[in-house]
């Protein structure tokens, strides 16, 4: 699918070939008809602190958007990883369960978390120039993503959740 178009927003790198769930800081990348890869954006990682452990439900588990698909243990946060999509887990990233630091070091590459099939395969298509995902609750427009992310970083800095 080629190299993702990336931009730097407020000091964080954003990949614009994927869609973002603003409340949970999860991203969704089309991997083919009805198939997506899910991971955590760099701001979600930053606000969690140093990651100690990540665990996921097993492949074959049904996913419901808004419900947990795993758990994250970090310096500043212990809690659920919330699915941005409904469907079924096709694969989990075993490398991340062995080395949670992959999510910090390479959130858009080796640090992906799960691959899933979607309930409605017609909602997603992969295109040669990037991915188009049309799912409720996910930001899709690159300009909208950048504005949301910059505002969230400013808010978190104001609240002292991340460094200036």
Model-derived features with residue positions:
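Short glycine-rich loop/turn motifs that provide flexible caps or phosphate-binding loops at active sites
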Residues: 48, 69, 86
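Non-catalytic terminal segments and appended small domains
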Residues: 1-65, 92-164
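Gly/Ser/Thr-rich beta-alpha loop segments that engage phosphate groups in nucleotides
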Residues: 62, 72, 89
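Short coil-to-beta-strand transition motifs
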Residues: 18-22, 79-88
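Small beta-strand-rich domains/subdomains or short beta-sheet motifs embedded
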Residues: 55, 73-74, 79-83
